[in-house]
Amino acid sequence: MDIKPREAPPSHVTTAEVVAWVGERLRSRGERMTRSRTAVITALGDHGGHLTADDIYRAVSAADPSIHLSSVYRALDALAHLGVVQHVHLGHGAASYHLSAV
């Protein structure tokens, strides 16, 4: 169920285009594009680079305070499982996440 590299969107696209692209891929696999998943992808797309779950949560909650930290973690887990997001451990600190589709 991973999104294959050949399916990646072209580089230099807007965050909205990435959200739409990921949504299409998820729906084609029978997955839902939830509000939490959309918010996580938007945060990663807008802020770029490697963000911790707490960084992502701060960005998400600034845009939509009704999304809880546990929802962000669930969205990150689901998106990582689907190959949309990758997480890395840099040293002994918290894991960081980035979009693998871009």
Per-range role (PLM):
Residues 46-52:
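Short capping segments at the starts of secondary-structure elements
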Residues 38-43:
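Pre-recognition alpha-helix immediately N-terminal to the DNA-recognition helix
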Residues 1-18:
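C-terminal regulatory/oligomerization modules of transcriptional regulators
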Residues 55-61, 72:
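A short acidic, leucine-rich amphipathic alpha-helix
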Residues 81-102:
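Non-DNA-binding regulatory cores of transcription-related proteins
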Residues 72-82:
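Basic amphipathic alpha-helical segments that dock to polyanions
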Residues 17-29:
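Short, Lys/Arg-enriched N-terminal segment that forms or immediately precedes the first helix
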